Every structure is written in C-alpha cells, then in structure tokens.
Amino acid sequence: MANDSDEIQMGARIKFASCFYSSRCRALMLVLSLLFATASVRGQTKIRSLTNVIEGHAVGGVTVDLVGNIYVADFGDFVWKITPEGKRDVFASGLYGASGNAIDNEGKLLQSNFYGNSVTKIDRNGQVKPFVTTGLSGPVGIAINRQTGDVYVANCRGNSIAKIATDGTVSSFAKSDLFSCPNGISFDHGGNLYVVNFRDNKMLKVDPKGAVAPFATISKKGLGHLCFKEDRFYVTAFHSHEIYEVTLDGAVRRILGDGKRGIVDGAGAKARLSFPNGIASSPWGRRLYINEYVNSESSLPRRTIVREIVLEAAK
C-alpha cells in the first residue's frame, strides 16, 4: 500500500511529465538546472590567483574601496592598486614598512608604517601625507569606527591598541598581557573590536571601553589579519598557510588550505596557500582578497601574489 510520501512523489512525477511538454516550463526547468549546477560547483569556498607574481618586499595589509579596487601594501616602500580584473599599478610610494591599511570616511587610504611608527594618509591620486608621527609602536592593522571616524591601530611592538581621533590626536585605548604582537583588527556590527595576534594563535575581543578578553583559538601558529563580512570573521593563518571562518559565538572552521605550503588554486583543503597575510572583503558578492608571500623568507628577490577567495553560498 502506498504511503503519503509515495503519493507525493507520484504527484510530483505527473506534474513533471505534463510540465515537460510546455515550452515555458521547459525553459524554467533549464534555468533551475543551471542554478542547481552552479550551486553544486560553488558548494565549497575556493581560491584563485588574481595577479602574477609581484616582486617587492613582503606582505602588508589589504583593503578594498567601494568600486572594488584592491590596495595591497608590501611591508616596504609601496602600495599597489589592483583592479578586480587583476590589472596592477603602483598607487603610492615612499612608505616605511607599509603594513595594515583601511579607507577612511573621506575615501583616503590610511596606511600604517611599521618601521616608521606612523600612519600616513594617501589621497585618491596616490599623494602621501603624514597623519600621525608619534605615539605608535610598530603599528599594523587599522580599523575605523564609521560613526565617529575614530581610527584604531594595533601596535605590534607595543602590545596595545591606540585610538586616533579625526584631528590626529593619539590616545591609549587598550593594553593587555593577552596581546602578543596584535596584528589584524576589525569591528563587528556592535562596536566591538576583534584582534588577532601574530606571535600566537589567539583571537581577542575588545569591548567599546577597551576591556580585552579571549575570544577564539585559531590554528596552531601565528595569525595575520582578519575581516568581517555577513556576521562572520575571516582570518589568515599566516604561519600555517590556511584561512579560517569564525562566527560571532566563537566557533572556528577552516575553509581553505590543509597546513601545507604552496600556491595551488582550488576548493577547501585541496587549495594551497603560502603565508597569507592581508585580507579584505569585496563591496559586492561573497568575495575576499588576500596577499601571500611566495618564496622562502630568506630568498631574494622577495615575491608576493594577490588571490581572490569566493566564499561558499550562505546557508
């Protein structure tokens, strides 16, 4: 005797058969089949190389503007500008250990200078001007409060977070023994800051009053940078060559790489990465951009590459 599920399946088959003879319905079925095929291909997060190898210094921060241009610092003298199609040019020069960066509310690029203990402002034409020249100690990651315009900088050498007012005044915002070369820094949508350490595998939460607390443990080694997109953080595991996703409740999931170093495009654990560091989100779609250090830390010339991550479909 047929059960309810059998009746439902039989009804579906009859409707499917009658639909097949309708040209409009066949067109709809074709569209749906293409959508399902696309969804199956995009079932896993995947990565592809966006640029050819760039000869330079090393890997600093990455940020993306509102029209999709990617700005990549080389931890040396330069910031590169790369279009979403992969065309690249030098955007700015004359920096001193160009590390983390972010675009402020005026559309200018704020660029940390690790060796110069400073932050510079770079306009849309690539003109570099000093912004902060004192009060920082090995600045790396930059995060901006979009409501106030205040800037927060991770001081790697100083194991602290500095706050920079819109007029350039620097004050101490957070200091803790939990910091171990704080490197990447990002806001959530509630005004909390999140920081990842370069010298260990800890992700920390800093509340709006500057109180620091453990948040998540990621991978087994030091971390690079992080970005926040659609209620998720995406973190580069610099020393273990992986990318991780972290939810707002602290759940950690590896989405790219298997811990083995290399430059291999692909999905999930089949992809290979090489010292991924900077990471930033595209203004549209589920895309991220990272930079990676291609050669060994001692070999010359130093070379880097920029790659695009396409996140799996939202669940």
Regions from the PLM with identified roles:
Residues 27-37:
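Bacterial N-terminal signal peptides
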Residues 45-60, 71, 75, 86-99, ...:
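Gly/Pro-rich loop segments of beta-rich domains
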Residues 65, 104, 145-147, 188, ...:
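Structural WD40 beta-propeller signal
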Residues 69-71, 108-111, 150-152, 192-195, ...:
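Conserved beta-propeller blade signature
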Residues 77-78, 116-117, 158-159, 200-201, ...:
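Short glycine/acidic-enriched loop and turn motifs that connect beta-strands
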Residues 82-87, 122-127, 164-169, 206-211, ...:
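Short loop/turn segments that connect beta-strands within beta-propeller blades
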Residues 275-315:
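Blade-level signature of beta-propeller repeat domains, shared across WD40, Kelch, NHL, RCC1
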